[in-house]
């Protein structure tokens, strides 16, 4: 497909969501191509996944930077060099600075392992189990300066079972992440091909209206 949106993917670890996007992007009809994969972790297995797919990679070790803003500037520079139009966070374990987010307005998407706006931050599977909810899931959303609060793109739900541990629930949610992230990327890539995207902070009604159950 011509005129594909160029996407930069930021990772820190295994890269299962990266692999899902790689697989989807190999289809001719997919509206996005991965221009570069950047990791702050030199040992991230996701780098091998990208290399195996002939995708350019770059390691930018955050430990080499005294200031978070300097690290973010280095990442942004590589994304600009690769002509990226959209950024996907796929297991990227760094909080981006407000300056970085503002430099890429409505051009950064993330996947979070809960049904936002519920259970923000870390250890969300434990939060869900402790709250005794019956449904958990994952959310693809735009990144804004406020953590886990950007406009929702899509969600997938899974049941929380009585015998669930944080690990078992996390594994089941991850399967849905692998399904929903490429779908959300496809949607956004099509939308930004000459069409503006309006920012809007999430609320409960947004989450309910855009719930996609893939379980």
Regions found by a protein language model. Give the residues of each.
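Conserved acidic residues
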Residues: 35, 85, 106
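N-terminal Rossmann-like dinucleotide-binding module
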Residues: 2-45
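Short, surface-exposed acidic-centric catalytic microdomains
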Residues: 32-74
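Donor/substrate-binding cores of folate-linked one-carbon enzymes
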Residues: 24, 90-199
């Amino acid at each position: 497909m011509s005129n594909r949106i160029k996407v930069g993917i930021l990772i820190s670890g295994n890269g299962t969501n990266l692999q899902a996007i790689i697989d989807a992007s190999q289809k001719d009809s997919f509206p996005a191509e991965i221009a570069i994969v950047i990791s702050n972790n030199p040992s991230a297995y996701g780098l091998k996944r990208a290399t195996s797919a002939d995708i350019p990679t770059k390691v930018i070790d955050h430990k080499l930077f005294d200031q978070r803003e300097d690290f973010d500037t280095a990442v942004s520079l590589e994304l600009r060099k690769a002509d990226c139009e959209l950024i996907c966070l796929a297991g990227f374990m760094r909080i981006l600075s407000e300056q970085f987010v503002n430099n890429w307005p409505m051009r950064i998407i993330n996947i979070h392992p809960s049904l936002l706006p519920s259970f923000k931050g870390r250890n969300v599977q434990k939060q869900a189990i402790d709250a005794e909810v019956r449904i958990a899931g994952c959310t693809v959303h735009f990144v804004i300066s406020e953590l886990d609060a950007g406009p929702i793109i899509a969600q997938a739900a899974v049941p929380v079972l009585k015998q669930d541990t944080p690990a078992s629930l996390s594994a089941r949610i991850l399967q849905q992440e692998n399904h929903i992230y490429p779908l959300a990327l496809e949607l956004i890539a099509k939308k930004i091909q000459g069409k503006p995207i309006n920012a809007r902070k999430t609320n409960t009604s947004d989450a309910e209206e855009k719930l996609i159950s893939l379980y």
